[in-house]
């Protein structure tokens, strides 16, 4: 294997700074693309789809769990899929392993859920084996998958629910588009409301708050504003900014 040359610390830093210019350009281009997603037209969902959940039948509205946004990943775990009934699709399983702790998305009024055609008894067993108990997972009972382009291949749909419980499809990605997902930021960037931070280019009236100060450990999101957890995060953010952390490619 032919590796790049070994260089001095000064040469390495110069090469790093040169690459950083392109990385920042990519970050800004990614931000601009997310801003365009937030301005995409929305498609009304007219059909009343029914799923089976761990507690019985569930509507698409139920999958939101009372939140404003819903991300749905089509996981192939059902008859005809390699490994059935002992396991789900290896590729889908790999993606599921990347999914962020749902509490971080929930804190941004967003729910994530998986859907398959496997019965709930098999889903429960499979979740326990893989350590995915915290992920909501529903059984398909109708044509929801084919209606939303995930009948034959994995993919991620995003929906928005308004104050009257009307549902709109706001985004869809499949194939290699799913590769970039898994982390909280990546998921929020494909939603209609985005990260909901005040630096974003977002349509007027969308919810926004100062960047990063809403972040918590995943079991501390119930801490109210002004609590020790909230104040600690605000202090940490300011300390990081003062130390020049914005020099990274994420700025």
Where do the PLM segments sit?
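Conserved segment of the thioredoxin-like fold in thiol-based oxidoreductases
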Residues: 111-139
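Non-globular targeting/processing and membrane-anchoring segments
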Residues: 1-108, 128-129, 142-251
């Amino acid at each position: 294997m032919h590796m790049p040359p070994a260089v001095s610390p000064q040469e390495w830093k110069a090469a790093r700074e040169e690459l950083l210019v392109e990385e920042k350009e990519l970050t800004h281009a990614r931000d601009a693309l997310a801003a365009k997603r937030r301005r995409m037209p929305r498609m009304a969902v007219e059909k009343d789809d029914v799923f089976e959940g761990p507690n019985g039948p569930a509507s698409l509205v139920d999958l939101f769990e009372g939140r404003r946004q819903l991300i749905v990943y089509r996981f192939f775990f059902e008859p005809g899929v390699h490994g059935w009934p002992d396991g789900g699709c290896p590729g889908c399983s790999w993606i599921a392993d990347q999914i962020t702790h749902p509490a971080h998305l929930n804190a941004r009024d967003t729910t994530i859920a998986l859907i398959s055609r496997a019965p709930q008894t098999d889903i429960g067993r499979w979740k326990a084996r893989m350590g995915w108990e915290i992920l909501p997972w529903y059984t398909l009972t109708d044509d929801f998958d084919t209606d939303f382009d995930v009948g034959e291949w994995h993919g991620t749909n995003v929906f928005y629910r308004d104050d009257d419980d009307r549902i709109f499809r706001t985004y869809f990605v499949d194939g290699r588009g799913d590769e970039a997902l898994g982390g909280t930021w990546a998921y929020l960037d494909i939603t209609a409301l985005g990260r909901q931070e005040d630096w974003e280019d977002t349509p007027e009236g969308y919810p926004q708050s100062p960047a990063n100060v809403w972040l918590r450990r995943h079991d501390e999101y119930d801490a109210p504003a002004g609590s020790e957890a909230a104040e600690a995060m605000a202090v940490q953010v300011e300390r990081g900014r003062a130390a020049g952390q914005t020099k990274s490619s994420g700025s």
